[in-house]
Amino acid sequence: MVQEQAILSCIEQTMVADAKIIKEAEQQLFEFQKQPGFTSFLLNIVSDDNFALNVRLSSAIYLKNKIHRSWDTKREDGIKADEKLSIKERLIETLVKNCENNHIRPILTETINGILVGQEDWDLAPIIKNLLSSGDASYIYPGLLLLFQLCKAHRWDMVGSRDYIDSVIEELFPIVEGIASNIGSQTDYRSNEILYLILKSFKYACLNNLPQYFSQPERIMSWVQLHLYLCSKPLPVEVMELDPADRSLDKRVKVNKWGFGNLNRFLQRYNKITKAITKEFIDYIFNTIVPIILREFFKDIEAWGNNSLWLSDSSLYFLISFLEKCVTIDQLYPLIEPHLQIIFENVIFPCLCANEQSIELLEDDQEEYTRRYFDINREGSTPDAASADFIFLIGSKRPEKLNNILPFINDIFTRFDANSSDINMAFKEEGALRTLSNLFSFIDEPSVLENIFGHFIVPLLSQDKYMFLVARSLETIALYSEEFKDMNILSQLFELTYTNFLNSNVLPVQIEAADAIKCLIVSNPQIHPAVSAHVPGMMEKLLKLSKIFEIDILSEVMEALVERFSDELSPFAKDLASNLVEQFLRIAQALVENPSETYSASDQEQEIQASGLLQTMTTMVMSMNKVPLIESLAPVVKFVVLHAQISFITEAVDLLDALTISSHLLYNQIAPPIWELLHDILDSFQTYAMDYFEAYSIFFETIVMTGFPQDQTYVQPLLEILSAKLESEVDYDIEHVMQILMYFALSMRDIPLFSKAIKVSTNDELGLDSKCIVKLGLANLFAKPIETLQIMENEGFTINFFTNWFNEKFYSVFAIKLQVLVILTLLKMPEVPNSVSPLLNNLTNKLVELTLSLPKAIRNRDAVTEGKSLEGDLTPEEEEEYFIECDDDMKETVLDQINVFQEVHTFFKNLQNEDAGKYEKIINYLDESKRDSLQVILEFVSQH
């Protein structure tokens, strides 16, 4: 028996103001929760009205957490089977009793969900049926709460494992339909709470797979009619009197939202034939259901347009998304095509226009306005975002319709130009700009677009009456990625953009001006000479802006400037680096110290900005390779590693890798701060880093190639990590280990862990890329041929290795050179091992083939570096393989300094002079064509 009074006392103490008392009480409760009966006692408190509400609420939270954590009986503190049965029965009773308590009810439903999700075979259907069939609203409501949780818990059940949830739906949905029919027209809050639960239950019932219940078409029609009725149902006066922001929180508005949402989701999910969805079903949806939905949606659009029906942003988003899907599906497009221009003019375009609410937001909260209308990471499920997608889709899928849209927006531009004092025309001007910017990719007449920029955008940037139009015009520039041909228009645009960036005090104008500057600079290299003198000033302003407002656009602009104006920024590099480091550490420290356990939108924004800052630092290091930045930037990497900031590991390691390469270039050695960071990283593998090995692999490759040849202090600790990862059974980690070991063999002329790597590579269940072990074997043969062959023999791997090698096709310069050098190494051996001698024919022919293929590989490597197309008739699969391999060509290795053509020439010349018999034997392995090819190569090398 638990100590009830002691537990109750502890619960009360968790609500006092003294942190020390709270902590002690929580520690005691943690010990109490291990005792049988603890969970039942918490439920006693929750269900007893005699206890104070705050005590009951706190107990409910502990109850929920305990059940979520300990429902598994196998746990040491797991709840026992007999207690579970009692808890389940009493949870339902407590929920029914407290369904009007807005504080306790949500916690109880979460608790029930925790049991359902925990793979518990808890059949709630009989209980739900009794509650729903009672005819009493006080029972129907908790019944629907339970149905909602049941559908939610089984939403991912796949075909073949849906028998239970299908039987529940078959039994309960007819009752639910009757309830919905009875209260569908009601406008009171409770009735709409019930309708809300009905719609959400439908959503989760159909989320992943179609319930068997809906195999009968008339049942689908019944639910569609219910949804359509709720979509067009006007809101009561009391809801319309609420502020729009508060209005969207009302359950009656949410019912409308999910009316549209479920219909949209249904079409998005069920528009293709699958194993479970028949052609007959799809035909019924397309030929019967969708036409009915569209007919009603068109009525809703008309009512919304004449203000007789108010729709929330979410409802509009789902409505537009449904229409968008109809545009993409060829069988449905004829249903919507005759109405497309009306849809554009009456729904899509108005959603893209400014309005009184958006302007009020700009005046009241510039930061939130910028986030809402210009932060691509925040747009999400809004009607203007859906409308922008709709416009882009028309350009992509139905380009013939642009002939109707473009004259419309041109007319808006012209009318605003003639009547710019009309605020309603200014609102429409924003819609025209947003429409235009989403069609840039589909307009093949640059001169037409440049004229629009000259005639309409330039004047908008010059006025200060409508600052929302200045911001939108700047965004329009930022979204145009083509090079300008008219230097006069380009000069005007840049000058006005630059002026707005420096002088405006309107935040969205400053942010979008920065983005526009980036786009103009990236797309128009011809203006770089004129711009270069202004770059330090722009960078200073960007740094100031980024301190007061967190958005990744600013980091992207800084990165673009650093990449293209490294010489101009070099004198300011250390100051710039210090500023970037200061900003990053400020954000990172705030994230580390954040007491909240939840991940908020603000956290995401901070992480995005911090990642952008790290990327800018990396670009600085790579672009300003003559500037020593190691001392300035190393603290950033150290902070990320020591504080285990997983969100930034990849970017921090990229920065460290760039710093390591920079150190090698500047000093021809690894600077002490890099070694210190390597020490910290190796230490972190004792705690958290082993799970993120892949992120570190690029740095390990670089340190192996550039650092270990000079200093072997950390060789053994790294090899221990690599050995552990070979045992991890994580395929991509193992492949990275083999890559690192390959570079280790080349740079250190040693072959550690090869035997272990062979054993792992033969595990077919891992599905490793066979090229990994082939390249590692080749590198080891290059480093220590005799020892490598001996290990292969001992592991019974020789035949396997050579078979895989001869069957693989490599495309990179690195891989071809490595193979040539390995073959030469084997052919040079005074006594060819028995395991290799039968392969001399294959090796000699492969040597000539590889040498012949090398010039093309070099040209392709240079083409990739210069951004040009690859040479030769490569299949798409071969091109993909090449681009995977070409990473090897971008790294500096010991092979870079070896001229393999010269090596081949020297080998055959020396062999001919020193061992004519062996020379003849090798030459005779070649047919006449290959002999001629070899002779051409040898003559070419001797002449050059």
From Swiss-Prot:
Nuclear transport factor (karyopherin) involved in protein transport between the cytoplasm and nucleoplasm. Required for the nuclear import of ribosomal proteins (RPL11, RPL16, RPL25, RPL31A), the poly(A)-binding protein PAB1, the HO endonuclease or the tRNA and snRNA chaperone LHP1. Indirectly involved in nuclear mRNA export through its PAB1 nuclear import activity. The keyword DNA-binding does not apply. One of its GO terms (molecular function) is small GTPase binding. GO terms for biological process: mRNA export from nucleus; protein import into nucleus. The gene is SXM1. This is Importin beta SMX1. SUPFAM superfamilies: ARM repeat. One of its GO terms (cellular component) is nuclear envelope. It holds the Pfam family Cse1. It is found in: Cytoplasm; Nucleus, Nuclear pore complex. Its main location: cytoplasm. InterPro entries: ARM-like (IPR011989), ARM-type_fold (IPR016024), Importin-beta_N (IPR001494), XPO2_central (IPR013713). Associates with the nucleopore complex. Interacts with LHP1, PAB1, RPL11, RPL16, RPL25, RPL31A in order to import them into the nucleus. Also interacts with the nucleopore complex proteins (nucleoporins) NSP1, NUP1, NUP116 and NUP159. Keywords: Cytoplasm, mRNA transport, Nuclear pore complex, Nucleus, Protein transport, Translocation, Transport. It comes from the Eukaryota. It comes from Saccharomyces cerevisiae (strain ATCC 204508 / S288c). Gene3D superfamilies: Leucine-rich Repeat Variant. Residues 25-97 form the Importin N-terminal domain. Present with 16300 molecules/cell in log phase SD medium.
